[in-house]
Amino acid sequence: MAEKQTAKRNRREEILQSLALMLESSDGSQRITTAKLAASVGVSEAALYRHFPSKTRMFDSLIEFIEDSLITRINLILKDEKDTSARLRLIVLLILGFGERNPGLTRILTGHALMFEQDRLQGRINQLFERIEAQLRQVLREKRMREGEGYATDENLLASQLLAFCEGMLSRFVRSEFKYRPTDDFDARWPLIAAQLQ
């Protein structure tokens, strides 16, 4: 019984990895059908549906992976790092680095891969970005408690500016067909971003 569960989990992972790879390829710039995905995995469409009730559920699973990866790592940064500027830098670099290492998933983060899918999937991505923005806002607000002084600029504005930078770099990555990596020149860009944190 345990072997059967492991085999089923492995097949599910194989399907999700194939979907992510298709999103990374030129196929990702078009609607991905279950027929194309089944051919990529080397199974029938019926076999796909034995593991996932719908393509939407496949995207749900990829979004869960994105959420778990980013939120878990953000929480680790907040636990390990106490300096506000370092926290913000690490969170921004985490988001950009995750996108760079996972180009297919970046198409999901930017909404590009979800254009032809159910609206609620885009809603989940919107919620993820709202959670990240709330985390950034909290880090900015905690500066006053941790370091004795806050920012002159409203923390809401600063948090949205940081997130807009991340979203812009991820969109540029997708638009360029993954030519312009989000972390390129980050060490030169960060001082420009940090200068806005007044």
From Swiss-Prot:
The record, for Pfam families, names: SlmA-like_C (PF22276), TetR_N (PF00440)
Q: Which InterPro entries match?
A: DNA-bd_HTH_TetR-type_CS, Homeodomain-like_sf, HTH-type_TetR-like_transc_reg, HTH_TetR, NO_SlmA, SlmA-like_C, Tet_transcr_reg_TetR-rel_C_sf
Recite the UniProt keywords alphabetically.
Answer: Cell cycle, Cell division, Coiled coil, Cytoplasm, DNA-binding
Q: Which GO terms describe its cellular component?
A: bacterial nucleoid; cytoplasm
Lineage: superkingdom = Bacteria
DNA-binding stretch(es), residue numbering of this chain: 33-52
Taking every annotated instance into account, which residue ranges of this chain make up the domain HTH tetR-type? 10-70
Q: Give the GO terms filed under biological process for this record.
A: cell division; negative regulation of division septum assembly
Q: Which SUPFAM superfamilies match?
A: Homeodomain-like, Tetracyclin repressor-like, C-terminal domain
The record, for HAMAP family, names:
NO_factor_SlmA
On assembly, the entry states: Homodimer. Interacts with FtsZ.
Family (UniProt): Belongs to the nucleoid occlusion factor SlmA family.
Q: What is this protein's name?
A: Nucleoid occlusion factor SlmA
> Which species does this protein come from?
Salmonella arizonae (strain ATCC BAA-731 / CDC346-86 / RSK2980)
Q: Which gene encodes it?
A: slmA
